[in-house]
Amino acid sequence: MTPVVALVGRPNVGKSTLFNRLTRSRDALVADFPGLTRDRKYGQAVVDDMNFIVVDTGGIDGSEEGIEVKMAEQSLQAIDESDVVLFMVDARAGVTSADIGIANHLRRQKKKVFLVANKTDGLDGDVHCADFYSLALGEVYQIAASHGRGVTSLLEKALAPFFEELTGKSAEEEAADEDAAYWAAFEGTDVTEEDESDEELTGEDRYADLPIKFAIIGRPNVGKSTLTNRMLGEDRVIVYDLPGTTRDSIYIPLERDDQHYIVIDTAGVRKKKKIYETVEKFSVVKTLQAIEDANVVLLLIDAREGVSDQDLSLLGFTLHSGRSIVIAVNKWDGLDQDTKEKIKEDLERRLGFVDFARVHFISALHGSGVGNLFDSIQEAYRSATKRISTSMLTRIMNMAAEDHQPPLVRGRRVKLKYAHAGGYNPPRIIIHGNQVKDLPESYKRYLINYYRKSLKIMGTPIHIEFQEGDNPFEGRRNKLTQTQIRKRRRMMSFVKKG
């Protein structure tokens, strides 16, 4: 499960600065859900290839209503959802009454808390941070979020237990394995017999026997539970809302037409009598973790309410995660033709940035159109895991360049040399050439659409990266021949005479 890191502290200690640095975004609003998480921002971050979700809580100032009230209103839920809490303080301001109140609350929580002193740039950190040990939260980690100093080492230590749980090895053991694999490859030997067996499974065979994991996501009360029950079969009356943490998604195996699936249910499958509840608890963290863990994301939209900002936020997070997408518009039955046309126009206008995703109009309650969702889920998964040879990718690239030449850059034509696969799920294509990094965004979109049409890729984003062609002679001096040496001597003699 993707770990969750919460940033907690009073106002102006640098939480948003650290959040923006971790999410590599200036506005950092990767997922902002009005009315549900009004005072919390959710983002996606990566440190040393370790993915995690970071939550920026509202500043807690105990001067007005009391520290406990503010904590309950803004940050208590974020702390409950998190695996790690980074309690941020201002090294320049020293210990405040608000810091003491927050520390008292955090000590009562069964969470791993790291005390982080920010704004230590230009200061004697040890002197200015000494007072923070009085908060009794252990070691004080010194960082400068605005410059990034100390951030990586802090996150590496905070996420180390989750890294070990994920790989079964410590970071040191993982690094040793990487070194062994590198030298084994360099010497032309294999590290383990298992590696040989893995190499035999190439292409789509590697994924053929694996179940397709798809997550059903959407705003509260759009029909996620109804759709899940419809897919599983109405006679299946099982309570999947097990006791325990509220942010754990439920993984339900499903088989249809000899294809195995795993449904990641973020709402919980409930008994029939509870399906029609008017209020459904919506956990942002649970939804974001389900997106991270899925192969395909099925976004459910309420036809009667249209596309909301929350839907767009969920789509944005899904695209950022590189997941395949299928869109289902629920509650389509009972609408008149004029209303349906208006809804379709609105969908086309607001969802233009995901025009590669299949859109289905369904009724989860009555089952109409639900069966077609499986075809699109399979199509999206196969598109995302499709193996394409270098020769095919290069040939399509050349065809695209012939149909529409790359533009001139500083008076010179951009030259595309060759293309190869850089990864899958989602497909990543690396194009090599001269001045390719100067290509305008319009031509990049043209290449993506050309590849999508040529390879019949639907339901998954395509990422194209450009690499400049290296000059093999750059930095090297040509070795002169004897004739060239004699010619240079003659020229030098004429210069001296002159």
Curated annotation (Swiss-Prot):
Q: Where does GTP 2 bind?
A: 218-225, 265-269, 330-333
Domain of life of the native organism = Bacteria
* GO MF entries: GTP binding; ribosome binding
UniProt binding sites for GTP 1:
9-16, 56-60, 118-121
Q: Which UniProt keywords apply?
A: GTP-binding, Nucleotide-binding, Repeat, Ribosome biogenesis
Q: Which Pfam families match?
A: KH_dom-like, MMR_HSR1
Q: Where is the KH-like domain?
A: 386-470
Q: Which GO terms describe its biological process?
A: ribosome biogenesis
CDD domains recorded = EngA1 (cd01894), EngA2 (cd01895)
Ranges where the EngA-type G domain occurs: 3-166, 212-385
Assembly and partners? Answer: Associates with the 50S ribosomal subunit.
Q: Note the PANTHER family from the entry.
A: GTPASE DER
The job of this chain, per UniProt, is described as: GTPase that plays an essential role in the late steps of ribosome biogenesis.
What family does this belong to? Answer: Belongs to the TRAFAC class TrmE-Era-EngA-EngB-Septin-like GTPase superfamily. EngA (Der) GTPase family.
Q: What is this protein called?
A: GTPase Der
- Identify the species of origin: Tolumonas auensis (strain DSM 9187 / NBRC 110442 / TA 4)
**Lineage of the species this protein comes from:** Bacteria, Pseudomonadati, Pseudomonadota, Gammaproteobacteria, Aeromonadales
- Gene for this protein? der
